[in-house]
Regions:
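Transmembrane alpha-helix/helix-exit interface in multi-pass inner-membrane proteins
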Residues: 26-45
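Interfacial segments of alpha-helical transmembrane regions
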Residues: 3-31
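Perimembrane loop-to-helix junctions flanking transmembrane segments
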Residues: 48-57
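Membrane-embedded catalytic cores of phosphoryl/pyrophosphoryl-handling enzymes
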Residues: 7, 56-138
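Short, charge-rich amphipathic segments
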Residues: 9-15, 52, 104-106
């Protein structure tokens, strides 16, 4: 649905926008693992506490700081919101990203600080890449 909206509104420019979105999500994901999780090595609550009850049977990887889900969805929401420049779209994407991020705590696989870190990292990456996009206007 989002891809359709981008193609419909941006036409020929949409291929570059989709590449930029992929770059943001890729940088958010790789950075959350290689810059944060492997550096801080903070165990997820489901690996640290024996009495954490998981909604699903999977706990995820060993380390949880920062949440890759949170960084990816916030990076996506910010970059799409900035490029498309539509307030209602940004609000909808921001609410969606917040629900996804909250679900990680609800599922018992992240601490709230993991989510906050992911939100900040995703926002940072998206804003840096957006500033480069605006500067070089692909």
């Amino acid at each position: 649905l989002l891809v359709y909206l981008i193609i419909k509104e941006k036409g020929k420019e949409s291929i570059w926008i989709l590449i930029i979105i992929g770059l943001v999500v890729g940088c958010c994901d790789m950075g959350s693992v290689h810059l944060f999780k492997n550096t801080f090595q903070r165990l997820r609550p489901c690996h640290f506490f024996d009495d954490v009850r998981l909604v699903t049977e999977k706990c995820g990887g060993q380390y949880g700081f920062i949440s890759s889900h949170a960084s990816n969805v916030f990076g996506l929401a910010i970059i799409v919101g900035k490029i498309m420049n539509r307030q209602i779209l940004f609000v909808v994407l921001f609410i969606w990203a917040t629900v996804v991020a909250y679900s990680r705590v609800y599922l018992g696989v992240h601490y709230p600080l993991d989510i906050l870190g992911g939100m900040l990292w995703g926002t940072f990456v998206a804003l840096i890449i957006f500033s480069l996009y605006k500067k070089y206007k692909i």
